């Protein structure tokens, strides 16, 4: 790949494109004209002149093109902060926005076309593999999917030119709607379409109207079934927190259209615009900052080949009319005082050859005080370490509210400087080398937390099996976990059972004992505080209901929701009706009657952990009893189905009932849910019967036994203790998740599977003080895992800097780690010739990179900037060599005083 590193290498036609800094621009470029190179150079050029990477947005049509663009950018910009730059297609941006801005539920999944087909195939009781393998059937499914998007856009009032799949509303569909409107005496308009869509099955009888033309009747049936399955698809995605690729666009458009607080971008470039559809272009318009934007469109009329995906050649015509902006670049610095910015700008202009007019300005005209800008020469490398440490201590002592960073060029320097600070008892935080969160030991701790929150987490179990040294490689660990899944087993079976499994245990009880299937309806989802307002149960033996069911309604002082999401809560009216008739039981009476009904039987529920634990806490409040003190074991039909049918899209009760054509209704009334769960339990038993023999054979296999024994020895004690305590609230004030991480660390350290983590306390403090801060989240491990674990999984060591939890006000950091951070005081360590630029550099590119590194280091300062260097160095043979201040400082040295 060709590498271009300065603006002079661009030809005359490219320079205006790269230098464009304001307005709307359209670049039409045939293949081979260096379009990708220009896109990359624009990134480097703009960033060197003050545009932050996180204010830039680089969009293209395909993921492949995005990867090529990013690779080219990386070839000309050697900068760790480049990770802040967004490069991707429009869908990628929308996905990133929706998830990072918490615009969708945390557990939302992005489904592809085949998964979308699978959802509809489930409703139609068809084989998804058969559909995918049949072009015509697959096309029909696509039309249903596209139609659901068309309805969404119609419902939300999108302009017609932004509709993604207007073609899915065919002429035949229009004929059908018109006929239904005639029969129902409705006006033919968009609202009529939406009305028919919402009630598609109710209008099927219209297709059987007397004297109706059979062709028109077929059109009506086709449309109404298409509408029905499209609505099923919409509802399924909503209930299961799923988005398809088109949803990413539609949701982002609606949010940006309505919410002015969404981040707008002052600098955008878009490649292959001829391939964008109207909705994508509309989203880009919404992303653009209104004040003085820089938007660069690049495309080629000769390569517009994606009309089947909604792209229109008219897009370029629109852009030709729009793109008439002037070329200029306005920036304003809101951080640095003028005396610092003068240094940065002179350095950028004279050392990095940046046009002064394109460099930032500031309104902060505070004058420099004596000692704010210093050059610190030391006699030797050894004394430089001491001098810099002493200066950091002085700044720490004299300015109790300020932060100080010593920025070094290598990890070795960071280590030596850290030792020098330790010798003078200066507390500091060192950020260099491998990130703490990337180490195997911390990953093992994270995996432990993940499986406590979700025992079906494949990757985390793999890490535990490898990290605890049960297997020598991740590959072997993955194979082992995959084998368990095929056998309807979980690694938890090996830790919670001696010679059995969850499935086998359930089946034995199902065949030989009575089971009480139960469900609760509650005032909310907080198992520690909410009340049970309905509790229902049925007793079964061998799947047959024995005796009478139990259905109790209970008084509460807490409010009952009228709606469950967008659906009316059927219990609301029923509850208040019983309240008015005086038919509600006191919590004490109802709970005691339930216990009497239960006796010593085994409990079973769907998602039983919720029902069991809210029951336990209600018993504690009202009867002073606990389920944990009783002999009743409990099983979960949801867990059983996840083990027995591991690849379903949903394990909600209603989905399972429909998927397996089971008798029962999921109505959000406990008694109905119990009846439905009984049907599901029978299915679980049927499926379990075919799994137990294989499980037993696996557990008894001579090659498996040693691994199971090793696994238990390495992890069982820790897991069982934490697993059993997930629903216990921590009363001592310490965060439950923090306590669990501590316990895991102590355990793994004692077992000898990890080395000591010197900086673990930083992680624990950060979690306690900066992350686990929502008072609405109960201090119980299960609740904190569900609420916080996704964010915790993205942490980096540099997140600690300037956080509330960090106690140190002095930092030692490499240049790369300092990117994106700011400090009151900055000391650049050993800015000598031979370091800046490095004496081992072999090209001008390397020298220029070192100049940029020095600029980055200096520009972290908000108040004081000190440049330190050693005037002599010692080689490995003991020879002394004179050194000078880096020549990069020649043009700005006049601003600095020199210490003596």
PLM segments and residue spans:
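Conserved RecA-like helicase ATPase core segment
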Residues: 2, 45, 278-370, 375, ...
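Conserved helicase NTPase motor core
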Residues: 3-19, 23-31, 116, 211, ...
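Helicase P-loop NTPase motor core
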Residues: 26-39, 43, 324-326, 333-426, ...
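Conserved P-loop NTPase-based nucleic-acid remodeling module centered on helicase motor cores
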Residues: 55-175, 317, 633, 655-658
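Accessory C-terminal helicase-associated subdomains
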Residues: 223-226, 454-516, 524, 539-540, ...
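Conserved non-catalytic scaffold segment of RNase H-like nuclease domains
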Residues: 513-516, 523-623, 628, 650, ...
């Amino acid at each position: 790949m060709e590498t271009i590193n300065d603006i002079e290498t661009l030809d005359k036609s490219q320079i205006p494109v790269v230098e464009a800094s304001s307005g709307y621009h359209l670049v039409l470029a045939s293949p081979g004209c260096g379009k990708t190179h220009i896109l990359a150079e624009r990134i480097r050029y703009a960033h060197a002149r003050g545009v932050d990477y996180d204010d830039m947005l680089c969009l293209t049509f395909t993921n492949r093109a995005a990867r090529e663009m990013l690779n080219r950018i990386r070839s000309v910009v050697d900068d760790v902060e480049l990770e802040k730059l967004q490069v991707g297609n429009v869908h990628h941006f929308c996905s990133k926005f929706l998830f990072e801005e918490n615009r969708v539920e945390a557990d939302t999944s992005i489904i592809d076309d085949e998964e979308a087909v699978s959802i509809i195939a489930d409703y139609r009781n068809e084989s998804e593999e058969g559909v995918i393998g049949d072009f015509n059937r697959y096309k029909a499914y696509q039309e249903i999917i596209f139609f659901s998007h068309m309805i969404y856009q119609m419902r939300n009032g999108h302009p017609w030119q932004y509709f993604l799949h207007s073609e899915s509303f065919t002429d035949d569909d229009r004929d059908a709607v018109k006929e239904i409107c005639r029969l129902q005496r409705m006006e033919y308009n968009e609202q009529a379409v939406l009305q028919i869509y919402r009630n598609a099955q109710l209008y099927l009888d219209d297709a059987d109207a007397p004297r109706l033309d059979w062709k028109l009747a077929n059109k009506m049936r086709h449309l109404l079934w298409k509408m029905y399955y499209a609505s099923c698809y919409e509802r399924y995605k909503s209930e299961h927190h799923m988005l398809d690729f088109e949803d990413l666009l539609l949701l982002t458009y609606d949010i940006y259209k309505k919410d002015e607080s969404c981040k707008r971008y002052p600098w955008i470039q878009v490649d292959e615009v001829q391939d964008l559809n109207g909705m994508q272009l509309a989203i880009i318009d919404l992303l653009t900052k209104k004040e003085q934007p820089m938007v660069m469109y690049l495309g080629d009329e000769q390569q517009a080949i994606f009309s089947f995906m909604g792209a229109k050649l008219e897009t370029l015509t629109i852009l030709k009319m729009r793109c008439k902006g002037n070329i200029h670049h306005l920036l304003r610095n809101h951080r640095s005082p003028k005396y610092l910015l003068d240094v940065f700008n002179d350095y950028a202009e004279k050392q990095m050859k940046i046009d002064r007019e394109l460099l930032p300005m500031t309104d902060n005209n505070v004058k420099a005080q004596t000692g704010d800008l210093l050059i610190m020469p030391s006699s030797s490398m050894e004394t430089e370490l001491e001098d810099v440490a002493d200066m950091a201590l002085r700044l720490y002592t004299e300015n109790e509210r300020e932060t100080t960073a010593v920025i070094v060029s290598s990890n070795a320097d960071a280590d030596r400087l850290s030792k020098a600070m330790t010798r003078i008892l200066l507390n500091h935080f060192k950020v260099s080398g491998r990130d703490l969160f990337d180490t195997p030991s911390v990953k093992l701790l994270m995996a432990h937390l993940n499986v406590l929150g979700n025992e079906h987490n494949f990757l985390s179990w793999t890490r535990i099996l490898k990290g605890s040294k049960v297997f020598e490689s991740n590959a072997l660990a993955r194979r082992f976990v995959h084998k368990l899944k095929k056998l309807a087993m979980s690694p938890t079976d090996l830790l919670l059972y001696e010679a059995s499994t969850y499935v086998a245990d359930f089946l034995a009880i199902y065949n030989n004992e009575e089971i009480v299937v139960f469900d609760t309806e509650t005032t909310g989802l907080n198992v520690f505080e909410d009340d049970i307002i309905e509790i229902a149960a049925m007793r079964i033996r061998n799947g047959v209901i024995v005796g009478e069911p139990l259905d109790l309604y209970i008084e509460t002082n807490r409010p009952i929701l009228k709606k469950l999401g967008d659906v009316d809560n059927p219990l609301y009216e029923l509850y208040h009706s019983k309240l008015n008739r005086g038919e509600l039981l006191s919590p004490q009476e109802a709970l005691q009657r339930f216990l009497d009904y239960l006796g010593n039987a085994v409990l079973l529920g769907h998602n039983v952990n919720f029902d069991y634990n809210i029951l336990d806490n209600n018993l504690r409040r009202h009867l002073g009893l606990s389920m944990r003190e009783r002999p009743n074991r409990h099983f979960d039909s949801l867990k059983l189905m996840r083990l027995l049918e591991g690849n379903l899209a949903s394990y909600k009760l209603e989905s399972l009932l429909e998927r397996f054509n089971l008798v029962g209704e999921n109505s959000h009334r406990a008694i109905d849910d119990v009846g439905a769960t009984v049907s599901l339990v029978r299915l679980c038993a049927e499926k379990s019967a075919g799994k137990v023999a294989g499980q037993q054979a696996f557990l008894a296999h001579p090659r498996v036994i040693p691994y199971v024994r090793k696994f238990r020895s390495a992890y069982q004690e820790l897991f069982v203790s934490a697993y059993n305590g997930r629903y216990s609230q921590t009363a001592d004030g310490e965060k439950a998740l923090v306590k669990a991480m501590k316990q895991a660390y102590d355990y793994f350290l004692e077992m000898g599977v990890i080395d000591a983590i010197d900086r673990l306390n930083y992680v624990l403090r950060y979690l306690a003080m900066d992350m686990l801060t929502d008072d609405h989240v109960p201090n119980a491990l299960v609740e904190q895992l569900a609420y916080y674990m996704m964010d915790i999984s993205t942490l980096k060591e540099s997140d600690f800097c300037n956080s509330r939890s960090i106690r140190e006000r002095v930092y030692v950091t490499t240049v790369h780690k300092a990117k994106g951070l700011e400090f009151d005081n900055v000391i650049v360590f050993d800015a000598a010739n031979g370091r800046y630029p490095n004496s081992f550099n072999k090209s001008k590119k390397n020298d220029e990179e070192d100049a940029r590194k020095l600029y980055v280091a200096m520009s972290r300062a908000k108040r004081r900037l000190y440049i330190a260097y050693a005037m002599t160095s010692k080689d490995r043979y003991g020879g002394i060599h004179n050194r000078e201040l880096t020549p990069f400082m020649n043009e700005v040295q006049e601003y600095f005083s020199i210490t003596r």
